Structure formats: structure tokens, C-alpha cells
A protein has these predicted regions:
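Cysteine-nucleophile amide-bond enzymes
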Residues: 1-209
Length: 209
């Protein structure tokens, strides 16, 4: 469904660094934007690529990788359209190489990094509005429609049940795993969505070695 976040378990050196820093299997995130808008009407993902920057790729681009689909819950059609429009407006922006070099330096040196510093390291970057990494691009797009990912609950909660106040995290501090951890995204398993029937599995007579 357009607006779904697709998490990817990559195997490059940078992917390994991201997975270590975030203590997660997920090193990359894409946004499913639906129709490419071209004459081919190809279904596409939007991502921030190291070499090509923010781009559209075919839906099947990561078909050989371990994936997880995270679907925003109760997203209205209007907000879904605004979300995708915001993300598409970043097409052509370049990748935030400063953030990449921070991760490469960490991977080469392999310092002892306390847990409390890991998010801060990921949050490093150039800060330029025309540069992004995969998860910050998607996080900024969701924040543009006020959709929560992992907000911070403020102390302004009254004794008589007033609505609590939430604070946004800066979008540069989000990592792919945050969409998996968010209570506001539903994890979708494609094999179940298409109608899984365990009785249709053909089992071999012996166990795998």
C-alpha cells in the first residue's frame, strides 16, 4: 500500500555498521510510493542511495533481500497523498556523505561505543536540507503530516485526564529500526497477506543439514 515503509537487511560494509550501531537487522529503509508517474505505470519505491541520491526504484529491486513492511495505521487518503508528495519533492537530492563517513570511520576503528551514544552517532550529518539518508528522508516525510514514529511524551499530563503532549524527535536521529519499533506502524508479512495455507507446503522426508 502506498505509504508503507520497507526495511531492508543489507550486507555491505556500511550496512554492517548501521546494523551494529542500531543493534538491529535493518540497515536501509524505502518508502513505497505506488505508481512511478511515467508512461510505464511501474510500481516504485523511493529511497536515498549512496551514489545516486534520492531516486525511484522498481518495487522488485530488493526482492532477494530479507525485508520487513511497516504500515502506518489509520492513515487518511489525504495524508497519504501529502506524505508521498513530500517524499517525491526530494527526488534528486544527494546522499548525506558526512553521515556515511561517520559510519565508515566507526567501522574501521571499531571503538567501544556506549549504547547511549549510538543514536547520537547516527544523527550526525551535514544538516543541509538537500542531503539525506534513507531513514531521515522518510521520517521527515511522516513528520510533515504530523504522523508519529517514536515521539517523546512530555511531562504536561494533568491529573484529570488531559490529552498528553508529545514532542517530535529531530528527523536526523531516526534509523530504520525505529519504524519497526514504533507502536504506530503495523508489521505486514506478505506471505500471510496473500493467503498462507500451511497444508500446501511440501516437506522433504529428511531434515535439512
Amino acid at each position: 500500500m502506498p505509504g508503507d515503509v520497507v526495511l531492508v537487511e543489507g550486507d555491505t560494509r556500511i550496512s554492517v555498521a548501521i546494523k551494529y550501531l542500531t543493534q538491529s537487522s535493518w540497515s536501509h529503509a524505502c518508502l513505497f510510493v505506488g505508481d512511478s508517474g511515467s508512461s510505464s505505470h511501474e510500481l516504485c519505491l523511493l529511497e536515498a542511495d549512496l551514489q545516486e541520491g534520492v531516486r525511484l526504484i522498481p518495487l522488485q529491486h530488493y526482492s532477494g533481500f530479507n525485508l520487513r513492511i511497516c504500515r502506518p495505521v489509520s492513515l487518511t487518503d489525504q495524508d497519504r497523498g501529502q506524505l508521498i508528495s513530500h517524499a517525491r519533492s526530494r527526488l534528486g537530492h544527494t546522499y548525506d556523505l558526512k553521515n556515511v563517513w561517520d559510519l565508515v570511520r566507526f567501522l574501521i576503528q571499531k571503538p567501544a561505543v556506549p549504547n547511549r551514544w549510538r543514536r547520537a552517532m547516527i544523527g550526525l550529518g551535514s544538516g543541509e536540507p538537500t542531503r539525506a539518508i534513507c531513514s531521515t528522508l522518510i521520517a521527515e516525510s511522516f513528520q510533515s503530516i504530523n504522523y508519529p514514529i517514536l515521539p517523546v511524551l512530555g511531562p504536561e499530563v494533568g491529573d484529570e485526564g488531559e490529552v498528553p503532549v508529545y514532542y517530535r524527535r529531530h528527523f536526523s536521529h531516526f534509523t530504520p529500526r525505529d519504524f519497526d519499533l514504533s507502536p504506530y506502524f503495523e508489521v505486514i508479512k506478505p506471505t500471510l497477506e496473500v493467503g498462507f495455507d500451511y497444508q500446501q507446503i511440501s516437506w522433504a522426508g529428511e531434515e535439512a543439514s
